[in-house]
Amino acid sequence: MIFSVDKVRADFPVLSREVNGLPLAYLDSAASAQKPSQVIDAEAEFYRHGYAAVHRGIHTLSAQATEKMENVRKRASLFINARSAEELVFVRGTTEGINLVANSWGNSNVRAGDNIIISQMEHHANIVPWQMLCARVGAELRVIPLNPDGTLQLETLPTLFDEKTRLLAITHVSNVLGTENPLAEMITLAHQHGAKVLVDGAQAVMHHPVDVQALDCDFYVFSGHKLYGPTGIGILYVKEALLQEMPPWEGGGSMIATVSLSEGTTWTKAPWRFEAGTPNTGGIIGLGAALEYVSALGLNNIAEYEQNLMHYALSQLESVPDLTLYGPQNRLGVIAFNLGKHHAYDVGSFLDNYGIAVRTGHHCAMPLMAYYNVPAMCRASLAMYNTHEEVDRLVTGLQRIHRLLG
């Protein structure tokens, strides 16, 4: 299949609108991606003609809704090449998936004196749950430091592991710098020390294929809304043997086998014991449509187009005076920058006036901001529906802001 950005853009209704009298250039997909009509229509159709509560319903609508939900679990397992669909838990998103691991596996396996390793480039969602766990049990949080070019100081990693290391929690791709970490060697090293590995894949799965079996990670988590799917839905992958050992972290309906006031409660098997309550079935249906949409385009095709666009963007941005870029030359998805000494908020506001949507702030990565000694950055993210023309508009906009503000 030949990738056509024009055909892709035609599937996204929002891309035809104007902002401040100008065509929208949406360069904020790393925060949340726009949704194609196929996803919007699939979710709407479910609510119009197929909605019912899932699990245990004997009527047709309930049975069909349950089947559709479980088919999405199967589709998602194929998307990341899991061994079994029963290794996948539906969660609200990456943040909940990481918290689930911290509160279920973490509470059962991390003790006083143990340690967990993260990196200085992590999103707060892959920092705070581990800080909370370490504070609860008296464990130590160790940090892989950054290099100025936005890569990790991997030479320090062997010195951080010891016999008390229980987990390496690492991002696949930095949400600020676009750095893709060398997971294979990091995971191998962790396993050599008897540690488990959790990968935050929120910024990776939309850019190229992910194979959890090849990676050999123990946990992999991502969100639907960054993958052109709905908000409020995500996937947590856990190796089957680990998942079956993990206790539930939330109680309620759908996750039990039996409930007795005198004899207590027993749990149903994984993954369903981690899905208490009524699930976001509409969101799950929408996620399935997003996975189908991206798979039909071909992630390798998407990767090739996006990499060419990224190379073009980095080349063109060299023409902007006083522009500071953060991160390595080889990157995925995002370009973080500051213009002179102007605050990122001001630069982003000017760009919005030109119809260009970028993200400004600390990007839920305050330790990374502290490393670069800045309060905030602008971040332009490139998705499969962005164009060379939109990159040109960004460059022209930044040049114009530089002339106006000096």
UniProtKB/Swiss-Prot annotation:
N6-(pyridoxal phosphate)lysine: modified positions: K226
Induction entry: Suf operon is under both the Fe-dependent Fur repressor and the oxidative stress dependent OxyR activator.
Keyword Repressor: no
Catalytic residue positions: C364
Keywords: Cytoplasm, Hydrolase, Lyase, Pyridoxal phosphate, Transferase
CDD domains in alphabetical order: SufS_like
Role played: Cysteine desulfurases mobilize the sulfur from L-cysteine to yield L-alanine, an essential step in sulfur metabolism for biosynthesis of a variety of sulfur-containing biomolecules. Component of the suf operon, which is activated and required under specific conditions such as oxidative stress and iron limitation. Acts as a potent selenocysteine lyase in vitro, that mobilizes selenium from L-selenocysteine. Selenocysteine lyase activity is however unsure in vivo. Can also desulfinate L-cysteine sulfinate (3-sulfino-L-alanine).
Name of protein: Cysteine desulfurase
Lineage, opening ranks: Bacteria, Pseudomonadati, Pseudomonadota, Gammaproteobacteria, Enterobacterales
